[in-house]
């Protein structure tokens, strides 16, 4: 790699050139710049999609720009790429106009210009990007005195002169961007900025959530830390703006019927049996594809799903989650490096495991209080004691014992949350509960729980990949061949809230009946109809809105899984010190 334009200690390997578009992002928000250029994270929005389509039209008409010595009096060259070797920046220009021997870069923007005190003007980020274009043109010997941005929404061209002040300011910004990219930590989020609600990465960045988590930690500092004065470190009360959409418009696709085949026609998945078309699903309307048992999928369909960033998840006939296919969209390697390093740090593993297990026990207790006809006081008191012991535990091994004792108390009273079915007597199998069993499950309730935990493991594995984690390197759950340990870590507090609740809903509302099970040897399995009924109950639960106790806004459980995964990433990257485990009242 060529020398950087400034003298810095690089904490990571950097590309040779800084794109002008990334200077635009840095001027808008250094944190956004870091996510997009360093971590390789990006999220589409309506504006980014429309802007990309418009730039594709410009790029399709690419024409060469003559050398500076051979420049004609008038020419329009499109999609021109040049670099500045001194500053290590590169710019792809939508249009370069040549009039009277002088060149002018023209950049196309989707939005509208800024209204300044003296009329229309460029936004600061657009001005910086255009200045970089002027720099690369001058470096290549072209006379360039000004630039133009064409704003499509208003159809207006706004000019800016490339004076010494603008070019010097932009050069300093380029140096700051290189330093930020090379630094070990991510820039802090903007505080109460009006830029955040319109940013396509707000669901990844979580600016207000990160700041609120930091403030909550300050309020909860141990008493002994109060013996020391820490100037400037006072708790700040903040409200979280509702910038994250409560629900995703995308839905998972479950294919449960044995023998069906999945193909692709254009941007549409087609599900067929041997004779007819059964179902169609647009790629733009689904977030994942789940194949249960003997379901075939074509290479063309897999390729299309990988290109669209939609994972394909594979389950056995019995509901065991055993594989996933994803595209090459996992770019956040620096998060994974930190994850691997902290997985070897006993203090971090113990602290995170305490919170995960404590949160799980608290949520088990809450579910009993909500749904049990008459929960035993001894059970509730025992669970509270187990939660307190988890917070004081000295090792992961001790936590495993505490978790096991809490599970015995919780599942010992689980039957009190199942309503008796009047039609059950005629069925071969019943929703009797005699304790937790698995591998294989030996009764209908345990068959539902096992399937539910498998599906939730899948959803958190997908969330881990989306954030940039390696789902197989956990903290509380130690790595084991074929086990997504980190997904199992994250799902601990959600087992009772999502799966156990969905199982109770499926049974108590008749979405799954005792006739939807078959006995195979010593195990019990769901029929195709039974699995379909449970998936309906599970997705109903995942779509339920719940209030986050720390941020005080309502989101669906599916959205919550991603938020909590990203909060763990904030902990691992050192932005916040303690994982805010999700518990409900």
How would you name each of these model-derived features?
Residues 2-10, 73, 120-121, 136-219:
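Metal-dependent nuclease catalytic regions and adjoining charged, substrate-binding loops involved
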Residues 236-317:
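Terminal-proximal segments
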Residues 59-66, 80-83, 229-263, 272-274, ...:
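Active-site helix-to-loop segments that bind/position phosphate- or nucleotide-bearing substrates
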Residues 107, 285-366:
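A surface-exposed, charged beta-strand/loop segment in the N-terminal or early-internal portion
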Residues 109-123, 159-164, 290:
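Short histidine-centered catalytic/ligand-binding loop motif
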Residues 120-148, 308-312, 454-461, 496-501:
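Metal-dependent nuclease catalytic cores in nucleic-acid-processing enzymes
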């Amino acid at each position: 790699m060529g020398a950087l334009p400034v003298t810095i200690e690089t904490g990571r390997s950097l590309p040779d050139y800084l794109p002008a578009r990334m200077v635009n992002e840095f001027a808008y928000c250094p944190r956004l710049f870091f996510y997009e250029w360093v971590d390789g994270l990006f999220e589409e929005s309506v504006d980014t999609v429309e802007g990309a389509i418009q730039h594709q039209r410009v790029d399709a008409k690419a024409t060469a720009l003559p050398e500076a010595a051979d420049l004609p009096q008038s020419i329009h060259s499109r999609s021109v790429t040049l670099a500045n070797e001194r500053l290590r920046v590169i710019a792809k220009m939508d249009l370069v106009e040549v009039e009277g021997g002088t060149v002018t870069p023209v950049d196309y923007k989707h939005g509208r210009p800024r209204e300044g005190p003296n009329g229309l003007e460029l936004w600061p980020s657009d001005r910086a990007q255009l200045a970089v274009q002027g720099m690369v043109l001058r470096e290549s010997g072209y006379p360039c005195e000004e630039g133009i941005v064409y704003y499509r929404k208003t159809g207006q061209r706004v000019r800016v002169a490339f004076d010494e002040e603008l070019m010097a300011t932009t050069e300093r910004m380029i140096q700051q961007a290189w330093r930020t990219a090379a630094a070990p930590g991510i820039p802090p989020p903007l505080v109460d900025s009006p830029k955040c609600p319109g940013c396509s990465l707000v669901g990844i960045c979580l600016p207000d959530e990160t700041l609120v988590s930091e403030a909550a930690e300050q309020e909860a500092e141990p008493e002994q830390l109060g013996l020391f004065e820490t100037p400037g470190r006072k708790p700040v009360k903040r409200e979280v703006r509702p910038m994250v959409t409560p629900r995703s418009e995308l839905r998972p696709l479950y294919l449960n019927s044995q023998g069906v085949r999945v193909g692709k026609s254009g941007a549409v998945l087609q599900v067929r049996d041997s004779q007819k078309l059964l179902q169609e699903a647009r790629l733009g309307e689904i977030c994942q594809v789940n194949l249960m048992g003997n379901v075939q999928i074509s290479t063309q369909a897999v390729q299309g799903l990988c290109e669209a960033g939609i994972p394909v998840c594979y389950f056995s006939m019995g509901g065991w989650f055993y594989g996933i296919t994803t595209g090459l969209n996992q770019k956040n390697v620096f998060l994974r490096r930190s994850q691997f390093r902290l997985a070897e740090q006993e203090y971090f593993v113990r602290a995170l495991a305490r919170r995960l297990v404590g949160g799980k026990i608290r949520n088990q207790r809450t579910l009993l209080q909500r749904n049990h006809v008459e929960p035993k006081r001894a059970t509730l008191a025992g669970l509270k004691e187990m939660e307190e012991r988890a917070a004081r535990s000295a090792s992961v091994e001790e936590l495993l014992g505490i978790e096991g004792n809490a599970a015995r108390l919780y599942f010992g009273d689980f039957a009190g949350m199942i309503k008796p079915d009047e039609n059950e007597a005629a069925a071969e199998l019943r929703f009797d509960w005699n304790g937790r069993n698995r591998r294989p499950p030996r009764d209908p309730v345990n068959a539902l729980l096992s399937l539910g935990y498998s599906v939730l493991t899948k959803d958190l594995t997908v969330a881990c990949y989306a954030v940039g984690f390696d789902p197989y390197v956990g903290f509380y759950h130690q790595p084991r061949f074929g086990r997504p340990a980190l997904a199992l870590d994250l799902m601990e507090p959600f087992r009772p809230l999502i799966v156990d609740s969905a199982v109770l809903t499926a049974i108590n509302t008749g979405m799954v009946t005792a006739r939807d099970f078959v006995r195979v040897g010593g195990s019990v399995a769901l029929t195709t109809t039974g699995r379909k009924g449970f998936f309906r109950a599970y997705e109903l639960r995942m779509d339920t809105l719940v209030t986050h106790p720390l941020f005080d806004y309502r989101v669906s459980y599916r959205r919550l899984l991603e938020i909590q995964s990203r909060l763990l990433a904030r902990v691992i990257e050192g932005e916040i010190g303690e994982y805010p485990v999700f518990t409900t009242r």
